[in-house]
Amino acid sequence: MPEFGKEEIANLTKVVESGVFCDKRGGFMDQFRADFSQALEAKHAIAGATAMLLMHAIPGAIGAGAGDEIIVDPVVQFHAIACLHNNVIPVWADVRPESFLMDPESVKRKITKRTKAIWVTHLWGFPAEVDTLRQIADEHGLYLLEDCAHALMTRYRGRYLGNWGHFGTFSFNMGKQLPTGEGGMAITNDDRLAFELNRRIIFGESPEVLSSNYRMTEFQAAVGVAQLKRVPGYLEIFRAGKAILDESLAGCSWLDRRGEPPDSQISPYFWSCLFHGERRGVEWGVLRAAMEQSGGGFQFGFTQKPGYLYEMFRKPNAYGNKGCPYNCHLYTGKVDWRPGMCPVSEDVIPRIVMTNNMALREEEYHSKAARLKEAIKLAEKGEVKPLEYTELDRRILKAIKEQGPLEPLEVIEIFDREGWGHFDEHTMYGRMSALRSYYPYKLSHAGPRKFAYHDLS
């Protein structure tokens, strides 16, 4: 958890006493913008209520709209959602297997006459190859946009992330490296782009362009001014914690530490490694069960699949069920997102092992490292206890065994019909995933969200 103290309280008190909670000339938002741009060595900093809202406004600021494409990476999908909000088609480029970051060679293959920009994610505080991506963007007359939500004060080849592209966006929600509750900041070194973004996020009675009201409040900025001073100290602790977690993999040949780009100083957000159990004959489910047995604290497989396989992207229903924006008459391309489009992402994402890398106490990192070491030992020795089935598990297995591959909603319908109780889709999917992923893995995948009975006995 972040630290909050006397300066945050004093700043918030000043806001309350001023009686002006937003748009205060010379107030905390003006100070926060100035301090942030100076800290990141950028010319302009534009504050918003959230980073996502700033991302929503950026395609319009660069002139992207109906008929255009923006190339994105598929491990997360926030930039792709921002594209759809602007009637822009996100086009998915693959990632590097060792870093999970956008692959410039894949980007080159995705560029068309419709491409307007490249939007790269610095996933979990690791810098993507923005020098190469900027070169590609310049060669093709494209904008380079950076999602730096996880990568505050991350340097790559001597320059802070966010400054390699035409825009860089940063998130200040409670789970980020500079928490203000909610909030975001965009940086740019281009006067025209700063003007275009500003007029899309704050307007009065007569806006000149399609705009909204995405202001940051004085309360958020007051906390941000104080928290910005704490960030270097936070990052020092996070980097030391990452080193402790990295060391826990010493001697393990089947969990690969994530590749760290040369000439960079990362800002750890999530720590991660990649599962290669086939090198030692260790099953994925066995590691998960071993981790639970040793105390847990790690997530397995992240979202399980790349963004383009999410239902919301596969169906053209961004605006009701009108077929927009994929079937827009201004769009001359074809949307056909299906498995196999980004093979590296599809292979890597389900094999990611990860945990939060933003604890402020060193003992928390040592505890996690010890649990991971113990899980590795249990998995290698085969000393893993099988998953203990609940009544819910037994009924799920019965339904799928008797009625064939099923999706969570289909299992819920059977439960309702049989009077076995009603469960929401999230809970049902979680239990079905556990039965697939934990020893003795009674289910297997039969589709993106479909499970089949898989008896290994």
Predicted ranges, named:
Residues G60-E139, Y143-C148, R155:
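PLP-dependent aminotransferase-like
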Residues D30-A34, A42-A45, E105, A117-T121, ...:
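PLP-dependent aminotransferase class I/II
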Residues N163-N198, E218-A221:
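Active-site PLP attachment segment
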Residues K401-L409:
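Short capping segments at the starts of secondary-structure elements
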Residues E146-L178, E205-E208:
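Conserved active-site segment immediately N-terminal to the catalytic lysine
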Residues M1-C22, M354-T355:
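N-terminal "arm"/small-domain region of PLP-dependent enzymes with the aminotransferase-like
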Residues F423, Y429-S457:
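Charged low-complexity interaction tracts in eukaryotic proteins
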Residues C22-E69, A82-N86, W92, R159:
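Phosphate-binding glycine-rich loop
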